[in-house]
């Protein structure tokens, strides 16, 4: 028998449902659509579609959606990344039926009124871009994805107004991605039977049939590349390593190792991240400082240390612990045989900031 904290997975009428029932009064409901930037037919269209979520639908205004949720003590949001557009609601457990209906209503009945694009959606998207551009680590990561994958995962996540997107483009893209086969429903603090019941009775069942875009996703990988971006402010040096799905366990352990005191230079790292996709993974680590010479010295130390063999087997338990907090993973991750890691010369490198003082890849 599964304990209350364990995951329950099931498939209902094409879409998948994953739940983790926990004690307490709070619940989180997520609808994850394989509609992130890697699937975009125009740069930034996934970001704009995400920003269209919780606008006016055919049955409720955007204001009514917000006010009803506030009265119930809940909140909703829509976010975008490279793999997903994610609709999320946080609420008291007893309000599960309302939020299942609210999220299904957004996917099925968003009205895409023409005036909302220039008046609400694009200004919000420009704000998102301005916030992201103020973060040099985000910019470095963006460069790494672009040189590592070019298209697909290398597409820009956020709308930058370079390529024009019309309301008809958004309608067409939404009809392609908002299908039964292309969504995953996750519940935390939610009973599986209850969630399945309310989902079955909701407009999720009225979504059209389509295809699971993730099943055909295949990334072309490029290694040994670098990119540089001059900007005012803090400087960042970042390393990116594309990872085959068979090596997810090893790099999950490496992420845990680099993020912990097990790695002697962990204090020099500003961010370590291992992101898993259905077909590939990507590990990045970054050094950031207001003084570019400090960044240069520290990234050389970190890369130099990693070019020596590191025993990462002692980080597997930490990696399993972190993995256990995730609601879902695109593949089964196994840690059998995780032992040593040694950085080879296939890594990619990005420098952002005062790049005249930052090293080139072949100087690491």
UniProtKB/Swiss-Prot annotation:
Bilayer disposition of the protein: Peripheral membrane protein
Organelle transit peptide residues: 1-15
Gene3D superfamilies from the UniProt entry: Metalloenzyme, LuxS/M16 peptidase-like
Transport as UniProt keyword: yes
Recorded GO CC terms: mitochondrial crista; respiratory chain complex III
UniProtKB keywords: Electron transport, Membrane, Mitochondrion, Mitochondrion inner membrane, Respiratory chain, Transit peptide, Transport
Record keyword Membrane present: yes
Pfam family, one: Peptidase_M16
Location in or out of the cell: Mitochondrion inner membrane
Main location: mitochondrion
Function: Component of the ubiquinol-cytochrome c oxidoreductase, a multisubunit transmembrane complex that is part of the mitochondrial electron transport chain which drives oxidative phosphorylation.
PANTHER family membership: CYTOCHROME B-C1 COMPLEX SUBUNIT 2, MITOCHONDRIAL, METALLOPROTEASE
Assembly with partners or alone: Component of the ubiquinol-cytochrome c oxidoreductase (cytochrome b-c1 complex, complex III, CIII), a multisubunit enzyme composed of 3 respiratory subunits cytochrome b, cytochrome c1 and Rieske protein, 2 core protein subunits, and additional low-molecular weight protein subunits. The complex exists as an obligatory dimer and forms supercomplexes (SCs) in the inner mitochondrial membrane with cytochrome c oxidase (complex IV, CIV).
Protein name as catalogued: Cytochrome b-c1 complex subunit 2, mitochondrial
Source organism per UniProt: Candida glabrata (strain ATCC 2001 / BCRC 20586 / JCM 3761 / NBRC 0622 / NRRL Y-65 / CBS 138)
Gene encoding the protein: QCR2
């Amino acid at each position: 028998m599964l304990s209350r904290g364990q995951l329950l997975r099931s498939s209902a009428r094409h879409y998948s449902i994953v739940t983790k029932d926990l004690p307490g009064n709070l619940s989180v409901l997520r609808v994850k659509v394989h509609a992130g930037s890697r699937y975009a037919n125009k740069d930034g269209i996934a970001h704009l579609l995400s920003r269209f979520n919780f606008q006016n639908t055919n049955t409720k205004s955007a204001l009514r959606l917000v006010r009803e949720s506030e009265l119930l003590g809940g909140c909703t949001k829509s976010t975008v990344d490279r793999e997903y557009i994610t609709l999320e609601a946080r609420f008291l457990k007893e309000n599960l039926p309302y939020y299942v209906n609210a999220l299904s209503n957004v996917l099925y009945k968003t009205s895409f009124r023409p005036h909302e694009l220039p008046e609400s959606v694009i200004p919000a998207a420009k704000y998102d871009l301005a916030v992201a551009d103020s973060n040099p680590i985000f910019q470095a990561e963006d460069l790494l994805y672009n040189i590592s994958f070019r298209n697909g995962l290398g597409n820009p996540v956020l709308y930058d107004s370079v390529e024009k997107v019309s309301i008809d483009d958004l309608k067409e893209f939404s009809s392609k991605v908002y299908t039964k086969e292309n969504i995953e429903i996750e519940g935390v603090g939610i009973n599986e039977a209850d969630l399945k019941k309310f989902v079955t009775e909701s407009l999720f069942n009225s979504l059209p049939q389509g295809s699971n875009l993730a099943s055909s996703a295949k990334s072309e990988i490029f290694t040994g590349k670098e990119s540089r971006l001059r900007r005012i402010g803090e400087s960042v040096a970042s390393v990116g390593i594309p990872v085959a799905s068979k090596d997810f366990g090893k790099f999950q352990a490496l992420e845990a190792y680099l993020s912990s005191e097990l790695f002697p230079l962990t204090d020099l790292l500003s961010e370590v991240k291992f992101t898993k996709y259905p077909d590939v993974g990507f590990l990045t680590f970054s050094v950031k400082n207001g003084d570019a010479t400090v960044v240069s010295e520290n990234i050389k130390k970190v890369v130099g240390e990693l070019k020596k063999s590191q025993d990462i087997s002692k980080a597997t338990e930490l990696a399993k612990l972190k993995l256990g907090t995730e609601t879902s993973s695109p593949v089964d991750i196994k840690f059998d045989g995780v032992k040593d890691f040694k950085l080879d010369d296939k890594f990619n490198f990005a420098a952002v900031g005062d790049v005249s003082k930052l090293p080139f890849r072949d100087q690491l």
